[in-house]
Amino acid sequence: METAGKAKKGFGGRKGGPRKKSVTRSVKAGLQFPVGRIGRYLKKGRYAQRVGTGAPVYLAAVLEYLAAEVLELAGNAARDNKKTRIIPRHLLLAVRNDEELGKLLAGVTFAHGGVLPNINPVLLPKKTAEKAAKEPKSPSKAGKSPKKA
């Protein structure tokens, strides 16, 4: 038997030996979002007959950027409210207070998000009445006491 001295072949013609650790496409692209899973969803969803190799990488990068942007703003909103945990209310405040994200997610309803605080200026008390109450009377009138005759 001649095969006793040679290394066995395996894995479709490659030489035997220790197998290399597989590197995911997410790692190659430097992303946290799963490129392979997004590619599978693109194919399974039948959005097109064929899906290019760069499409899931690009889509994963875009989704990761949007998620990071929303989470950063929501974290700021949580910190402003002196909280350490992001809740749906913070997500709503973050998205609605940002002009571009507000346009992108205009038709989205956030469960348990509440509403933006907004009071119509007509309903607010008049500023002139506040100023008149705070200002002291003129010193010439306020400083003099009535003279006794």
Swiss-Prot record:
Subcellular location: Nucleus; Chromosome
Positions of region (Disordered): 1-25, 127-149
Quaternary structure and partners: The nucleosome is a histone octamer containing two molecules each of H2A, H2B, H3 and H4 assembled in one H3-H4 heterotetramer and two H2A-H2B heterodimers. The octamer wraps approximately 147 bp of DNA.
Ranges of biased composition (kind: Basic residues): 1-23
Biased composition (Basic and acidic residues): 127-138
Residue window of motif SPKK motif 1: 138-141
GO cellular component term, pick one: nucleus
Pfam family, one: Histone_H2A_C
Family: Belongs to the histone H2A family.
Keyword annotations of the record: Chromosome, DNA-binding, Nucleosome core, Nucleus
Span of the annotated motif SPKK motif 2: 145-148
Chief localization: nucleus
Protein name: Histone H2A
Top-rank taxon: Eukaryota
Role summary: Core component of nucleosome. Nucleosomes wrap and compact DNA into chromatin, limiting DNA accessibility to the cellular machineries which require DNA as a template. Histones thereby play a central role in transcription regulation, DNA repair, DNA replication and chromosomal stability. DNA accessibility is regulated via a complex set of post-translational modifications of histones, also called histone code, and nucleosome remodeling.
Domain notes for this protein: Contains 2 SPKK motifs which may interact with the minor groove of A/T-rich DNA sites. Phosphorylation of this motif may regulate DNA binding. This motif is reiterated in both termini of histone H1 and in the N-terminus of sea urchin histones H2B, but its presence in the C-terminus seems to be unique to plant H2A.
UniProt GO MF annotations: DNA binding; protein heterodimerization activity; structural constituent of chromatin
